[in-house]
Amino acid sequence: SELYKKGYLYESVSIQPYSPAAGTGLSSHELNQPGTYKDVKDTSATVMFKAIKNEKLKIKNVEGDVFFMAWTTTPWTLPSNLGLTVGPNIDYVLVQTFNPYTHLPVNVILAKPLVSKYFKAEGENGDFENYEASVKLLPWKILAEFKGKDLEGAQYKQLLPSEANTLEKIQEITPGATPFKVITDSFVTTEDGTGIVHTAPAFGADDFKVGKKNNLGILTLVDREGKFVDGLGEFSG
């Protein structure tokens, strides 16, 4: 009781490895971490999060929608997305181009050092006026440059809204949470992806740490068998 009175005992959550097959959590010692990690080629997804154009988005005088391009190797965590993390001192750019699938005009934000991974150099300042679906080379041009810290606080529309991940559900679990915003942290790099990290605090130690620091809330939409919970539409079960 003395430990409790002194504030040394408290209830909280932490991120732990979990085995759906065994139906139990596993310690890092049981898994011999970090020795269990190995480099493998895996499928990744680049996801477009639609920015809300209000006073918190410091990019002004841009026609059309603006999207944050985020990269993930765990697309099954996207329904639990609560934030986007950028590097505070990384250089980012706003690029005007076309969506290669819908062929509609679009403005996207990503890290400047990674532009060449998504856009061909010969397409820079290309022919926007005559672009159409049959044109192989996407025209693009940089409209603005800024630091990651300039994006902090910008808001975006929830990617996959459903009955199970409403704001009310999130705030029921974590009262006062303010999800769906851009936050900053030093763990973000420009080695892979877009320089914008999809952040789901329930899945991953870094995500949980920055989520707690920035009051994103927490949302676990996978059950103990590794299946999506009810309320996620076609994804459930």
Task: Describe each PLM feature range.
Residues 1-225:
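NTP-handling and nucleic-acid-processing catalytic cores
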Residues 196-198, 232-237:
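The substrate-binding groove and active-site-proximal loops of carbohydrate-active enzymes
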